[in-house]
């Protein structure tokens, strides 16, 4: 089985400037293995100008601490994500090492990603809300029953380049791909979407617990109502599945789930 890294993505401006979508716990490994992310000869930090966050999951945010040596960072996220990162001490810890410019991301409002010097890049993001009715465990732990926000805990992003009008969608956590969410996937050239679990009862089948995929905020891939068939009925866009749990049989290179996904996603 090939080694897998977390679901962090890098978005380039075509001129060497890079922005990250989320920041996983193994970010330091990814930085070492990706030459475009190496510091230049006159720079002690990687050429990463900012990070846009889909949520406050540790799988998506612990890598922020790997960037603590940066002179300054632009971080984009919703108000709910900022509160959660402050409560779990990730954000205060990062702020004790470097200057963090927090930019509030509001669903439905497009914004340009900024370079470290504050000038806008040609790369833009447009967040859309993907908060489900049942919050993920990390979010439930920080909100008393009935007090959780109804939006902004989880978002996806449409990511584009003002020079080319090409668009990608980044949605690594989604509990239900309903009609509202599917509209944001239209006219995209690439879709990166949640592949945490292959089936809804995967943890039970693997004797790893009783929670279902949907109860944890993740739509399963397989099945008549799974994300694979749902997306294929509505788009022929190239699909990349991301954020795989270690129980997911799609990890096995020649297994039936991998073959079925490969035939459907290309």
Predicted regions and their residues:
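Core dinuclear metal-dependent hydrolase active-site scaffold
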Residues: 1-36, 40-42, 105-184
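Active-site metal-binding motif and surrounding structural segment of the metallo-beta-lactamase
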Residues: 16-77
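Short, conserved loop/helix-junction motifs that constitute active-site signature segments
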Residues: 43-46, 67-71, 94-96, 184-187, ...
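Active-site neighborhood of divalent metal-dependent phosphoester bond hydrolases
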Residues: 69-71, 80-104, 247
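A short helix-to-beta-strand connector/capping loop
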Residues: 71, 95-101, 120-123, 260-265
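Short internal beta-strands
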Residues: 73-81, 192-194
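General small-molecule cofactor/ligand-binding pocket signal
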Residues: 76, 101-106, 126, 265
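Cap/insert and terminal regions of metallo-dependent hydrolase folds
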Residues: 151-156, 162-167, 174-266
């Amino acid at each position: 089985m090939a080694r897998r890294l977390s679901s962090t993505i890098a978005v380039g401006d075509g001129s060497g400037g890079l922005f990250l979508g989320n920041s996983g716990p193994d970010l330091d490994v990814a930085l070492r293995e990706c030459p475009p992310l190496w510091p230049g000869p006159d720079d002690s930090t990687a050429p990463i100008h900012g990070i846009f966050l889909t949520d406050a999951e540790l799988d998506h945010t612990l890598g922020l601490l790997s960037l603590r040596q940066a002179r300054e960072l632009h971080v984009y996220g919703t108000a709910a994500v900022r509160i959660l990162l402050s409560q779990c001490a990730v954000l205060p810890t990062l702020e004790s090492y470097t200057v963090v410019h927090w930019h509030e991301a509001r669903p439905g409002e497009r914004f340009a990603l900024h370079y470290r010097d504050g000038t806008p890049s040609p790369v833009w993001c447009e967040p859309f809300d993907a908060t489900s009715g049942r919050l993920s465990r990390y979010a439930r732990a920080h909100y008393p029953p009935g007090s959780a926000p109804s939006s902004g805990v989880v978002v996806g992003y449409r990511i584009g380049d003002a020079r080319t009008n090409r668009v990608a969608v980044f949605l690594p956590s989604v509990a239900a791909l309903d009609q509202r969410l599917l509209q944001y996937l239209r006219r995209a050239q690439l879709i990166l979407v949640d592949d945490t679990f292959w089936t809804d009862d995967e943890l039970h089948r693997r004797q790893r617990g009783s929670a279902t995929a949907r109860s944890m905020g993740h739509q399963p891939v397989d099945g008549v109502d799974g994300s694979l068939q749902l997306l294929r009925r509505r788009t022929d866009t190239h699909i990349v599945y991301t954020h795989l749990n270690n129980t997911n049989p799609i990890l096995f290179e020649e297994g039936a789930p991998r073959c079925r996904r490969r035939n459907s996603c290309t």
